[in-house]
Amino acid sequence: MLPDNAIGHKVEELLLSHKVDTSAIAWGGKRLGIYFVDKGNNYRTSNIIYDREHSSISEASINDFDWDKVFDNASYFYVSGVTPALTQSAADLTLYAVKEAKKRNIKVSCDINHRKKLWKYGKKIEEVMPEIVKYSDIVFANEYDAIKILGVDSDINVDSDISDEDYKSIMDKLIEKYSLETVITTRRETIDSNHNNISALLYNNKNLYKSKKYNITNIVDRIGTGDSFAAGILSGLNMFKDYQYILEFATAAFCIKHTIPGDWNLTTKEEVISLMESSEKLDVKR
């Protein structure tokens, strides 16, 4: 949902400029939720300041949306833990939406995406997200999310690095508990604010797929990298059949976003594939 004012319509124009279908946008509310980034450097971490109270989506209701239009020709429906963190009504809206998607046999993809600063209306994430995950097919979650938020029973210590076998043990329980199809996890080793090592895991049908690792120095912007990874997975599922290839595609998109300022991954399918199939950093295109 976007506010029916100049700012809301400017957002629609921006979406249209990138060939995003905006026909199902609901218009209402008075303001667009925003956030500010106090960008860190070296050993100083970045800090996010949210300004999302009374935003259109935080006050939206089920009846604000034309659900037939929302789900028309959809193959996947994506939600994250950011929306239900805003208000009780936003949490109710998210739950209704995933139930509606399942009724229509549309696969639901859910990113736990825990943002502690947003959960201020009286509910904790572990009280809300499990019910949403019940209606999901694909979940973006790590072992900490599985145990601490989604209630997987395990004695494995997830406060430090774990083995592949321990990871599979936890994810087997998560998949069984919620009847999931696939669980996907990003890995990030932070050397400092400008230097990270990243990779990803995909677990499906008891098969663990591991991406190659990218050593990223001189990071331009970390904001939006997780969303870029999720977008890479979903677009990959629509384009490719092989899970290893899909994971490598998404991880390359994840990597590229670290080089682009702002919240948008302004890259192309061709650039992503070029990186994922290269063993070296890319040279200047001439």
Briefly describe each language-model feature range.
Residues 1-81, 272-286:
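Conserved N-terminal subdomain of the carbohydrate kinase-like
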Residues 22, 108-109, 140:
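Hydrophobic beta-strand scaffold residues
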Residues 41-42, 203-207:
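Short acidic-glycine loop/turn motifs at beta-strand connectors
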Residues 53, 82, 113-117, 144, ...:
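Active-site beta-loop-alpha junctions enriched in small/polar residues
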Residues 92-105, 127-135:
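Catalytic-core regions built around general acid/base machinery
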Residues 101-107, 178-181:
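A short helix->loop->beta-strand "cap" motif at the edges of active sites that frequently abuts
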Residues 118-205:
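Conserved phosphate/ATP/ADP-binding segment of small-molecule kinases
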Residues 209-279:
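Conserved post-catalytic alpha-helical subdomain immediately downstream of the catalytic base
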